[in-house]
Amino acid sequence: MNKIYLAIIALLALTSCANTYEIKGTSNVSTLDGRMLYLKILKDNNFKSIDSCDVLHGQFHFQGNLDSVKMGNIFMDDEPVLPLVLESGDITVKLDDAQQIVSSTPLNDKLFKKKKKYQQLQNQQRELVHKHDQAIMNGSDMNVVTQKLNAEAIQLSEQEDKLITNFVTENFDNVLGAGVFFLVTMGNQYPMLSPWIEDIMSKATDNFKNDPYVKD
C-alpha cells in the first residue's frame, strides 16, 4: 500500500512540474534596470497581467503554472516589449540593444527562428531608404534609381507576406499560428482583408478561426 501511495505522489509531482514554466531573463539595456516588467496574456480581448517583477542588476524572473500552452507578452508599463510562448519548461529571455531573443523551449525556438528571418527582411527594406539617400548624394538619375528601388521593395514585401502566410498555416493547430496572426494584424485600426489574410483564412482550420486571437 505504501509503495502505491508513494508512486501516486511521485506521479502527481511529475505532472505538476510538467505544467509549470520558469522565465529567466537578462538585459543590458540600462533604461530597464529598476523598472517593473509585466507578463500578460490576452483574455476577453484585453491583455491581463498574470505576473510582474523588477529588473535588478540586469536580471528578471517570472514563473507560474499552466493549464494549457498560451501566447504571452512581456510589457513595460503599457508598452509591449516582446512576445513569447508560455509552455512547460525553463524559458530563456535575452534583451539587449541589438536583439530580443526567447529560447530553450520548442515553440519559442520555432517562433524566434522565424522572427529572425522576418527581421532580416525588414532590415533590407530599411536599407532601401539608405540607398535612395545615397543615390541623391551621388547625383544619380533618380528616375532610374526610384524604379529599381520600388521593384526591390515590392519583392521584399512579397517575401514578407509569404513568410508570414507559410508560418501561420504551418501552425494552424498550435498557439503560434493564431498568436503570430494577431501580432501582425493588431496594429490595424479596422478589419482588413489583404490578399495574404484572405489566403490564410481560405485555408484555415476551425480551430484557428475560433481562436480568440483570430475571432475577436
Give the residues covered by each predicted segment.
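Intrinsically disordered, low-complexity regions
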Residues: 11, 63, 161, 165, ...
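Hydrophobic alpha-helical membrane-interaction elements
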Residues: 13-16, 208
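Sec-dependent N-terminal signal peptides
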Residues: 4-14
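Charged, long alpha-helical assembly modules
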Residues: 169-172, 176-216
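A non-transmembrane, solvent-exposed segment enriched in polar/low-complexity residues
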Residues: 17-165
